[in-house]
Amino acid sequence: MEPVGCCGECRGSSVDPRSTFVLSNLAEVVERVLTFLPAKALLRVACVCRLWRECVRRVLRTHRSVTWISAGLAEAGHLEGHCLVRVVAEELENVRILPHTVLYMADSETFISLEECRGHKRARKRTSMETALALEKLFPKQCQVLGIVTPGIVVTPMGSGSNRPQEIEIGESGFALLFPQIEGIKIQPFHFIKDPKNLTLERHQLTEVGLLDNPELRVVLVFGYNCCKVGASNYLQQVVSTFSDMNIILAGGQVDNLSSLTSEKNPLDIDASGVVGLSFSGHRIQSATVLLNEDVSDEKTAEAAMQRLKAANIPEHNTIGFMFACVGRGFQYYRAKGNVEADAFRKFFPSVPLFGFFGNGEIGCDRIVTGNFILRKCNEVKDDDLFHSYTTIMALIHLGSSK
């Protein structure tokens, strides 16, 4: 097959000259045809000629909705690697957006330790990095990838935001949230490594990642990793305290490990502890969080908490739900009844996809940031009372109209 040098160059004698003319000159027709192609195919045909390249750019600009790829127990159990890596490799061929930022979460047991390590600690760590690297390589080079591993995963199956979300407390699972570049919205990863020799946070470090001196800041997803190490939890609280008193939504928790952060120039140290996350800035963003404390212990009280979240009146189109729960909740907490909190969320938010994890501590409280940016609290919670255990944080993030 000869390479195509230009739309106007057609060397095949069987090609209809009228079709050649249309596809070489009529941008409206070309653009209409290209709207049916996934992003990977669009990038391939963009090299055909200048007209097609411009049409591809316009088509990609219209694809601004967040997309997700998920892998649950149905996809698990194969020997050729973690299910999330396999499913992402398959599904990226059909994704219609060009991912600019990716947030993925996977279960720590199988993502970190795919092979029996037989007490050889170093072998287990090497496997972890190889799995993460394989996943990172699937995304475009310019894409910002942040990945964490946790004891359990909350995921919505692919296909529709109205699919029943699954609380997978044990087992091979994961998801990847794909954020395109959205006009008027900036998503920035941040990372602060705990250095025993220097625990001071410089103001410029926070400013560079949009956490300070940023009037557009609306939401911060924040995760402490390896918090079982000495001083790690205190460091997490120190970092969060630098921006927690602002009128923003703050949600997250403590996870096992940081597995990917492609914005970092240096290789990740799986033995290190620190704080990582994403900041969301833009006046179009609306968000809310609710805290399900230890008093929430059955379906009725879980649904009451979702009613508080519903009362925030956050638009549900182009909105993502997050659930950050303690490993002590879930099936056993609700007297051998599974999926209670995820089902309660689905009852009140029938079309919003839900993602998250079961972790080792939760960060957040009842807060609402509305369109006119008024901070409200649904009940009396002190500003500094953001760190919890045996609780669940439910969050909504609305990224504005996708049009």
UniProtKB/Swiss-Prot annotation:
Keywords: Acetylation, Cytoplasm, Nucleus, Phosphoprotein, Ubl conjugation pathway
Molecular-function annotations in GO: ubiquitin-protein transferase activity
Every F-box domain range: 21-67
Tissue specificity: Predominantly expressed in liver, also enriched in cardiac muscle.
Biological processes, Gene Ontology terms: cellular response to starvation; nucleocytoplasmic transport; positive regulation of proteasomal ubiquitin-dependent protein catabolic process; proteasome-mediated ubiquitin-dependent protein catabolic process; protein modification process; protein polyubiquitination; regulation of skeletal muscle fiber development; ubiquitin-dependent protein catabolic process
Chief localisation class: cytoplasm
Gene Ontology cellular-component annotations: cytosol; nucleus; Z disc
Subcellular location: Cytoplasm; Nucleus; Cytoplasm, Myofibril, Sarcomere, Z line
UniProt PTM: Phosphorylated by EIF2AK4 at Thr-127 causes cytoplasmic retention of FBXO22.
N6-acetyllysine: modified positions: 194
InterPro entries for this protein: F-box-like_dom_sf, F-box_dom, FIST_C
Pfam families to which the protein is assigned, alphabetical: F-box, FIST_C
Residue numbers carrying N-acetylmethionine: 1
Keyword match Methyltransferase: no
Quaternary structure note: Directly interacts with SKP1 and CUL1. Interacts (via C-terminal) with KDM4A. Interacts with TP53. Interacts with MTOR; this interaction promotes 'lys-27'-linked ubiquitination of MTOR.
Function of the protein: Substrate-recognition component of the SCF (SKP1-CUL1-F-box protein)-type E3 ubiquitin ligase complex that is implicated in the control of various cellular processes such as cell cycle control, transcriptional regulation, DNA damage repair, and apoptosis. Promotes the proteasome-dependent degradation of key sarcomeric proteins, such as alpha-actinin (ACTN2) and filamin-C (FLNC), essential for maintenance of normal contractile function. Acts as a key regulator of histone methylation marks namely H3K9 and H3K36 methylation through the regulation of histone demethylase KDM4A protein levels.
Record-given protein name: F-box only protein 22
Source organism (scientific name): Homo sapiens (Human)
